[in-house]
Amino acid sequence: GVDEEFLEFMGTNPFKIDVTIFKMVDGLHHPKSCIKEAQELAADAYGVKKSFFAVNGTSGAIQAMIMSVVKSGEKILVPRNVHKSVSAGIILSGAIPVYMNPEIDEELGIAHGVRPSTVEKMLEQHSDIKAVLIINPTYYGVATDIQKIANIVHSYDIPLIVDEAHGPHLHFHEDLPLSAVDAGADICCQSTHKILGAMTQMSLIHVNSNRVDANRVQQILSLLHTTSPSYPLMASLDCARRQIAIHGRELLTRTI
């Protein structure tokens, strides 16, 4: 039933695995077999408590993270230069944003990350903030002192959320900036399709501490995700995980 020109261009393999949900291939919303195992392998690769496949890209993952951590009427500290998905997550959760300014590079005319001192000052001024979200690395590839920020945030016993869209590779090489999970961020998401080998829109969410309820993350993802996720796309995410876990250091050394 596939268009002939499209079939000639793509070949038959993508369509052989483009199936709907049934027992043999598992289901993303209540994974019990191969998807469950794939997510566990991702968690093992990154050294975290729990990993989730995010089929709506990092935009959907960011919305899920915010909705999992803060409730309606609660305050969340975010940079001014956030992606629109952060604004969407705040709207959907009913949370109240408290904004902090990133560092501005006057020479390049771009925004960098936030300084640890900025985070500390804002938390001192707003004692009722329930979570902090930062971008690291930034959309321009600039990393901040995420370890110091994590320490400051955790001194208030609140979760640190990290938009690590451009950093799914950081964990796999010691010469790269510190990754969110290695800094102790409580939850982060990554665009596996941007930097690693997954197909477009495939991302990962990592839960890294008890400050975030992994069961709630699963529930929120079930609210946001399609009930017909693409198996070719999910397979590409699993294979990207395998590649970076097995060959990541070698590939990154060559690149660096």
Which residues are covered by each model-predicted region?
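N-terminal glycine-rich, Lys/His-bearing helix-loop that initiates the first secondary-structure elements
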Residues: 1-12
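Conserved N-terminal alpha-helix of the aminotransferase class I/II PLP-enzyme fold
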Residues: 12-60
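Conserved PLP-enzyme active-site core in the AAT-like
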Residues: 8-9, 30, 48, 58-256
